[in-house]
Amino acid sequence: AGRTVFTGYRTSSKLTFQKDTKSTYQITQEFSAADLSEKRYYTNGVTVPNSINAATPDCTTDVTEHSFQRIRLGYGNTTDDVKLSIDGKELTPGTDYTVYKSVSDFDPSKLSADDTAYIQETGEFVFGKNVAASIKDNDKKLSVTYVKTGFDSSDARPEYYYNCKDITNAVTLDAGGNVPHDAAGDIIYSDPSKVVDFKFSSQEIKYTVANSTDITVNTQAKDVMDTGIKRDVDELIDVVQNAVNAHDKVSQIKK
């Protein structure tokens, strides 16, 4: 009773967070060139004016579409503590890529072919055309290590999908709610003994049913679903909401 079949050996644990939590995890995800996907970004959104300036009566703007390759992390709303490595070489934030807190801070029209951007809100790296081409043409491997504080109810627990560390009780967040770092960029632990290190591994539970015959009786979450499912739903909701907002603006303009 009360056992789960998606959580490996931890059959008494839940796959998802059961309530909103302020837990802090350091998570590492591995990607290949095949994980890059296309996403469209838009600029020059329409703002409905409160009044018309007689000198410039034409308030129309041309919405511009920008298409880039990106990788999406398992979670959005991460901290700015994110490290990207390509083929084992760690890139430097501020030099090799720019970190933006929200989508509204990111201007896709200014992302050059040789630039890379990271958006904390959506948890995605956006690659300029030359960078993306280099990754794909050379089948490069990418690794991202990032910190996330705060998970919603129903979010998948990272330990069932990734190599990660639960550092909730091992660090003291600063006034801004961020994990403190030293000059070298390493996390400052207030109590290192309280770091819970999860090394992701296959955890099949097998029963012996006959001589030299075993059967696997559990299914692990990673084999049937990934954290991208919830991210896909979130993006779909955003698209629908943007469409609703667009229709509302048209209605206001027609009034």
Describe the residue ranges of each PLM region.
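S/T-rich, low-complexity, solvent-exposed segments of bacterial secretion/appendage proteins
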Residues: 1-255
